[in-house]
């Protein structure tokens, strides 16, 4: 026997037993963004490496350690996209979507990061995100947060997530704070871990995001960015909080919250949960007003968020919120005898035509009545249709209930669709 080929580490299959939960999640996402008037955008999986170096930042973990990068046959450096925002901006600039106009966009698809696989975090993962361009006011920051809150409500996890908010100010304010933070960190340079020492001069705000408890203890007295904000940045953040209060969205201001990507300014946020252990963040985002211009477009305000779907699926499973996921089959059609088999196929096709939303599976491969009923039960169908010689002779179909304690019924063939529509 030939050696079996396995999936690449950290890149997982979604099996038929798992896909109904994924489909439910994707449906909720699509319905929610539609309710807010957002339009879908789809971008290539492979992009120029320079796109991510210029947007994410060359001294970030993603660019330094995690990107899947390779040279194509022309010698161009290409990268499997590690996130969706940069690609959305690139497409918006390239096709003139962002020039002097507002855009509300959403995307969903696979992303790739070469990091250590663990529960809820994989090397290929599915990401959903929304991006708004051309609006620089706090009301649209509030809108994307309201949209995300609506997602939790529709998924039944509203009580299990918490919104954390912070503001990073504008680039000038952040530069002043950066200098103050470096000065503070230099006092403890020898006590910082290797990663924090490396970040101290290249990206000091990321030191605030450390998971090392010893470094966290050193940061208790670190300066807070909020103290370095100008009047305009303070007013923006204050108005955002006011809007969230008005619509009843609870939040916690976390002055240590920074984002792992260089392009954020002003509003940053994360939805976190205590139900997933160390991988507590389930959605994150913020404002990135300089990125469109940085990637060759006109100066354009922007705000958005992204969420990893694997982590949401894990949360739904952890909270045991998967019991209402329906099976993929409503009706299973069986046949006894060659003539009946032909008629059974015709009946199944007629049902699919007359009831477009009905999910009908036909038995294939032969077998006696017991075997066919076993397959029908395994399919998850609510009803099995039995077509035998007697039923054919009387122009009827036997309806057998698989999930309810009801007696089997004989239904006229020409009234079958109407009958089933009332039962399912």
Curated annotation (Swiss-Prot):
Gene3D superfamilies per the UniProt record, alphabetical: Anticodon-binding domain, Bira Bifunctional Protein, Domain 2
One Pfam family recorded for the sequence: tRNA-synt_His
Statement: the UniProt record of this protein carries the keyword Protein transport: no
InterPro entries: aa-tRNA-synth_II (IPR006195), aa-tRNA-synth_II/BPL/LPL (IPR045864), Anticodon-bd (IPR004154), Anticodon-bd_dom_sf (IPR036621), His-tRNA-ligase (IPR015807), HisRS-like_core (IPR041715), HisRS/HisZ (IPR004516), HisRS_anticodon (IPR033656)
Entry's localization field: Cytoplasm
Gene Ontology terms describing biological process: histidyl-tRNA aminoacylation
Tree of life domain: Bacteria
GO molecular function, one term: histidine-tRNA ligase activity
Catalytic activity: tRNA(His) + L-histidine + ATP = L-histidyl-tRNA(His) + AMP + diphosphate + H(+)
Keywords: Aminoacyl-tRNA synthetase, ATP-binding, Cytoplasm, Ligase, Nucleotide-binding, Protein biosynthesis
Family annotation (PROSITE patterns): AA_TRNA_LIGASE_II
GO cellular component terms attached to this protein's record: cytoplasm
Family the entry assigns: Belongs to the class-II aminoacyl-tRNA synthetase family.
HAMAP family per the UniProt record, alphabetical: His_tRNA_synth
Subunit and interaction comment: Homodimer.
Name of the molecule in the record: Histidine--tRNA ligase
Species whose genome carries this gene: Shewanella woodyi (strain ATCC 51908 / MS32)
Gene: hisS
